[in-house]
Amino acid sequence: MKFRIGELADKCGVNKETIRYYERLGLIPEPERTEKGYRMYSQQTVDRLHFIKRMQELGFTLNEIDKLLGVVDRDEAKCRDMYDFTILKIEDIQRKIEDLKRIERMLMDLKERCPENKDIYECPIIETLMKK
């Protein structure tokens, strides 16, 4: 079955411009065209767009998705390649979690030192943030 760009957009929950953008980036292949120039997309493109959206939901950037699709598209790709890619993403997420925990601790500390009845120019939160 083939889909025009509007049908593909509706089916995948994206807009037409997103599809064109992904084409320019090479995330999805350039589609066949009708004699009148309409783009006609395959079910394979539908599956690929669903994959891209799911990866974005999991926190992958378009650059990371492009690299991942490069692994998927290689004929000689092995499951180990996906495993290695996943390990790198897990390590990246763990670093981000540690950074967020550090920021949370700092903000909790600032919140505890904030007397609510002081004027803004005496606020320890602002004083601390301006010093660093």
UniProtKB/Swiss-Prot annotation:
Coiled-coil ranges per UniProt: none
Keyword rRNA processing: no
InterPro entries the record matches: DNA-bd_dom_put_sf, MerR, MerR-type_HTH_dom, MerR_fam
GO biological process: response to mercury ion
Stated consequence of mutating C79 to A/H: Loss of mercury binding
Result of changing C123 to A/H: Loss of mercury binding
DNA-binding region per Swiss-Prot/TrEMBL record: 5-24
List of residues binding Hg(2+): C79, C114, C123
Molecular function GO terms recorded: DNA binding; DNA-binding transcription factor activity; mercury ion binding
Keyword Nucleotide-binding: no
Keyword annotations of the record: Activator, DNA-binding, Mercuric resistance, Mercury, Metal-binding, Repressor, Transcription, Transcription regulation, Transposable element
Annotated HTH merR-type domain residues: 2-71
Disulfide bond annotation, renumbered to this chain: none
Known partners and oligomeric status: Homodimer.
Functional summary from the UniProt entry: Mediates the mercuric-dependent induction of mercury resistance operon. In the absence of mercury MerR represses transcription by binding tightly to the mer operator region; when mercury is present the dimeric complex binds a single ion and becomes a potent transcriptional activator, while remaining bound to the mer site.
Descriptive protein name: Mercuric resistance operon regulatory protein
Gene that this sequence comes from: merR1
